Amino acid sequence: MPKAEPVISLENVSKFFGPFQALKDVNLTVSAGERVVICGPSGSGKSTVIRCINRLEEHTSGTIIVDGTELSEDTQNIRAVRQDVGMVFQQFNLFPHLTVLENLTIGPIRVRKMDKGKAEALARKYLDRVHIPEQAGKYPSQLSGGQQQRVAIARSLCMEPRIMLFDEPTSALDPEMINEVLDVMVELAGSGMTMVVVTHEMGFARKVADKMVFMEGGQIIEVAPPEKFFTNPDSDRCRAFLDQILEH
């Protein structure tokens, strides 16, 4: 991949929750079109990194620059960044009283000031892309978990982001529903979308990642291309983690 100016840059980022240090001097860059997968044991700081990139958590020290904008206490900056950064969570966070179509159009209409007809056309385009166009008129409670997560992905895409963040998007799903969500994410990766994904799904990571990141104890322990990461990682801690997770 040709070197490009990073669209995400974290420099010496630390984060405290009270006395607990969740992130310790984290340095990470993500280039346009790059797919980065972050893995590591529970409590290693993976989700905190993702949440800091979208300013859902405020970092304590260090510098975070997203798409040329430094994240600071300037709310205008934060609003601008969030319009260009989509996020998909473990939980689907759909509005239960709105139809699927309404869940997808509310952001473009209210935030992007798009007219309703254009927003609905955009929503149908992305429902088609995640392979559930027939669910537009249903309510979230009428859908399976896998379908709800695909709606959540489509909802993020309706904001036409330049970057997509995924925080363990399959961890709340039944096993038989995981692949239908991962398949959509593989297709999205193939389209050239910049993606940062926290996941334990190593088959997915092997398939799409340009760069693997292993975290433990709030620190980045290893960064490597997938072919090296999965066959010959430098750190013993990373090797032990992979031995454990790849057994299952």
Per-region residue spans from a language model:
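ABC family nucleotide-binding domain
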Residues: E5-P226
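C-terminal boundary and immediately downstream tail of ABC-type ATPase nucleotide-binding domains
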Residues: V223, E227-H248
